[in-house]
Amino acid sequence: MSFTFGCPAAELVARFRAAGSLVWVTVISPAEAAAAASAGADFLCVQGPEAGAHRGTFTNEDRPAEEPGLIPLIGEARRVTDLPLVAAGGISDRSAVAAALAAGASAVQCGTAFLRCPESGAHPAHKAALADPRFSQTAVTRAFSGRPARGLVNRFMRDHPAAPAAYPEINNATRPLRSAAAAAGDVERMSLWAGRAYRAAAARQAAEVVTALCGT
């Protein structure tokens, strides 16, 4: 069982494990790592701020403008738990994989690296935007869902910089707009989730991406 946006209570984790399930919890800080370990999680996804899409934070509170990157975060998590750690956020090439493993991760998790693959279910306009020079940066926003998420900066994000921390209310309110934007291929109003290393995403087979990441 995989959890994000929070960690289930220890009693519930114990029930999952008794039923034969392993429990995976996404964490973004040493405090969350310690809490998930204490609850009985089997392994942790340590998500750095470089990651695309929603931050896996347990709360919806504001985060510091500058947070430690993935590599120092792995080290901080390792100091509070000996559970296996899966590193996520900005993993785009063989050197990033090697750095995460050297820092103490047991494995890595990639998302943005596969967005432009033909096997990806991302909208064609989203795939194209990742290589479009008009989109030159990513930022964290609550504009689309009410929870912090990293994506390509487009008009909708620029027009709504102060969206409230109201999830799922904002998510429900923007759903019709996002659906209409996707139907029209309107990249200025779509949620173009992407990590900081989005320019490294290539339009090639997923197997080729895996080979490049593994260095084999």
Predicted regions located by residue number:
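Active-site entrance/lid segments in N-terminal catalytic domains of soluble metabolic enzymes
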Residues: 1-80, 213
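Conserved active-site-proximal phosphate/metal-binding subdomains
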Residues: 51-86, 92-216
